[in-house]
A protein has these predicted regions:
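Transmembrane alpha-helices
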Residues: 184, 193, 207-245
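C-terminal transmembrane helix and the adjacent membrane-cytosol boundary/short C-terminal tail
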Residues: 186, 190, 194, 201, ...
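Transmembrane-helix boundary motif in ABC transporter permease subunits
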Residues: 104-136, 149, 157, 303-311
């Protein structure tokens, strides 16, 4: 808060005691909404959040230049706050999303790619593999909220993992992303011409050598693209995270995946439904921009990797 900031200034430089010092402080959320024009000024006093004196003072300070609109950079370094909405930030939600994406990458991509290689190149064609393929395709079409229910039952109810932790969110999103990674990887492997396999086998290469030395490098651009798009899709999911407790208010920045946290999509949902949503409009827009920037970044990486490793024949 501003009081703590003032205390820290004095403790850092005791010579400030007895001096006049100009400092900038954040206005109250209701004052911000009033000056932004998001409140009907024609409403009677009993329906206004601010007293007539405070409203008049705010207008006078705005007109005289004492109060001004500036970009609050603390939104990127501060966690959410209920006691002081003006200091609310995205740091906690951003770190929560970052931890979850790392878990998704570590779990879903290796397992998904390995499963796809086995099913496409090595698994015998029988009724068991047919059932597995049908189930994978069905899982890819399951609504994401079902994975949230599954995660709440298994990871929280049965395994007793911490509620609202990025670890649980990452595991749930990994389950949701796995079918997408498997399907895109198999499609990339199928796109490699059969003549590549036949030529390698004809020159004496084993089945394993053919797959890992010749087929997989050619399929790599499609595999990487599908994996990153799956991660980007998981980044924007909200419904499964609500069911594992990530909608709870958390006023701290997580240091590990085991700490309680929120996520960017959930934070957007909470701010938009807040009773002070008029005040949180700017913060909601900033959170959306950050989320879109992350997704655009992931998709740009996917396009770059595809262009870099693409092989034409």
């Amino acid at each position: 808060s501003e009081a703590y900031r003032l205390r820290d200034m004095v403790m850092k430089d005791p010579s400030l005691v007895g001096k006049k010092e100009d400092i900038k402080v954040l206005a109250d959320a209701n004052v911000d909404v009033w000056l932004a024009g998001n409140i009907d000024r024609s409403l009677p006093d009993e329906q206004q959040q601010l007293s007539p004196e405070v409203r008049q003072l705010a207008d006078e300070m705005k007109a005289s230049g004492v109060m001004e609109n500036t970009f609050n950079t603390n939104i990127f370094v501060s966690p959410d706050s209920r006691s002081s909405p003006a200091t609310s930030g995205l740091a906690g939600a951003f770190m929560g999303s970052l931890f979850m994406m790392l878990i998704v990458i570590i779990i879903s991509i290796p397992i998904g790619v390995a499963s796809a290689i086995y099913l496409e190149e090595f698994a015998p064609k029988n009724w068991i593999t047919d059932v597995i393929e049908v189930n994978i395709n069905n899982l890819a079409a399951v609504p994401s909220i079902v994975f949230g229910l599954l995660g709440a039952a298994i990871f929280i109810g049965w395994m007793h993992l911490p509620l609202s932790a990025p670890l649980v969110g990452g595991l749930v999103l990994s389950l949701m992303t796995l079918p997408t990674v498997i399907i895109t990887t198999r499609a990339s492997l199928k796109a490699v011409p059969p003549s590549i396999r036949q030529a390698a086998l004809g020159l004496g290469a084993s089945r394993v050598q053919t797959v890992f030395h010749h087929v997989l490098p050619l399929a790599l651009p499609g595999i990487l693209t599908g994996a990153i798009i799956g991660v980007a899709q998981a980044l924007g999911e909200t419904a499964p995270l609500l069911l594992i407790g990530m909608s709870a208010f958390v006023a701290s920045v997580p240091a590990t995946p085991f700490d309680q946290s929120s996520a960017l999509p959930v934070q957007i949902f909470l701010w938009q439904g807040n009773e002070l949503r008029n005040f949180f409009e700017g913060r909601t827009a900033a959170a959306i921009i950050v989320l879109l920037a992350m997704m655009i970044g992931l998709n740009s990486i996917a396009i770059w990797l595809r262009k870099k490793f693409e092989v034409r024949w």
